[in-house]
């Protein structure tokens, strides 16, 4: 099994992290270890390849960054757990759809460990609780290698989601783990559990 490096990076600025992710993907070869980065970002909107300006309703003072991942606009901020997956899909013998499924199921597994019943939707990537979106996915594949990843709402200020049509869906309600649990979850514990779930679903456990 190829090596997997997992980095818990804490709160890091979006743009330098994006550049580091691009650089790793650009410079890697068949011997480069796969990496998963688990982190938080300061407030930022990111607009995917399919992103339409009309879904940015009122960004205000929050910066907007155009990126090469799939999907529409989303929001990142403190208290949201972001996982970036830099994986050699050919080496893992994984298709993009299989990777998306593994990511979604990892989130379902993680949330189930907290007693939260969540599920993916066939027509809208991400993970949902009773129709409300708790996690978003957006990937890019270059030369058979993935980058970008997923974002799970843990314990955060949700109001910036009201400034956009999340993922291009007007009126889509976003939800977070804190709202579904008797007490706020420990962020570091959620991060560790997501690492374990991703390792298991990707065959690294």
Swiss-Prot record:
Location in the cell: Cytoplasm
Keyword Ligase among record annotations: no
Predominant localisation class: cytoplasm
One Gene Ontology MF term: lipoyl(octanoyl) transferase activity
Keywords on record: Acyltransferase, Cytoplasm, Transferase
Entry EC number(s): 2.3.1.181
PROSITE patterns (UniProt xref): BPL_LPL_CATALYTIC (PS51733), LIPB (PS01313)
Residue positions of the active site: 167
Residue numbers binding substrate: 69-76, 136-138, 149-151
Pathway connected to this protein: Protein modification; protein lipoylation via endogenous pathway; protein N(6)-(lipoyl)lysine from octanoyl-[acyl-carrier-protein]: step 1/2
Domain of life from the UniProt record: Bacteria
EC class: transferase
Record-linked CDD domains: LipB
KW Transmembrane helix (keyword) present: no
Catalysed reactions, as listed in the record: octanoyl-[ACP] + L-lysyl-[protein] = N(6)-octanoyl-L-lysyl-[protein] + holo-[ACP] + H(+)
Function: Catalyzes the transfer of endogenously produced octanoic acid from octanoyl-acyl-carrier-protein onto the lipoyl domains of lipoate-dependent enzymes. Lipoyl-ACP can also act as a substrate although octanoyl-ACP is likely to be the physiological substrate.
HAMAP family the UniProt entry points to: LipB
Additional record remark: In the reaction, the free carboxyl group of octanoic acid is attached via an amide linkage to the epsilon-amino group of a specific lysine residue of lipoyl domains of lipoate-dependent enzymes.
Protein's recorded name: Octanoyltransferase
Organism: Ectopseudomonas mendocina (strain ymp) (Pseudomonas mendocina)
Gene: lipB
């Amino acid at each position: 099994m190829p090596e997997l490096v997992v980095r818990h990076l804490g709160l890091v600025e979006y743009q330098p992290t994006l550049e580091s992710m691009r650089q790793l993907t650009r410079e890697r070869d068949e011997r480069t270890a796969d990496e998963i980065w688990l982190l938080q970002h300061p407030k930022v909107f990111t607009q995917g390849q399919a992103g339409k300006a009309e879904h940015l309703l009122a960004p205000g003072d929050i910066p907007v960054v155009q990126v090469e991942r799939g999907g529409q606009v989303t929001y990142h901020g403190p208290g949201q757990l972001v996982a970036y997956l830099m994986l050699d899909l050919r080496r893992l013998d994984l298709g993009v759809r299989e990777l998306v499924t593994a990511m979604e199921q990892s989130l379902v597994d993680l949330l189930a460990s907290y007693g939260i019943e969540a599920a993916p939707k066939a027509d809208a990537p991400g993970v949902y609780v009773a129709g409300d979106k708790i996690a978003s996915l957006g990937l890019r594949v270059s030369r058979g290698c993935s980058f970008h990843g997923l974002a799970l709402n843990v314990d955060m200020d949700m109001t910036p989601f009201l400034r956009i049509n999340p993922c291009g869906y007007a009126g889509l309600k976003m939800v977070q783990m804190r709202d579904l649990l008797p007490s706020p979850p420990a962020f570091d514990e959620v991060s560790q559990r997501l690492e374990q779930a991703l390792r298991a679903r990707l065959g690294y456990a």
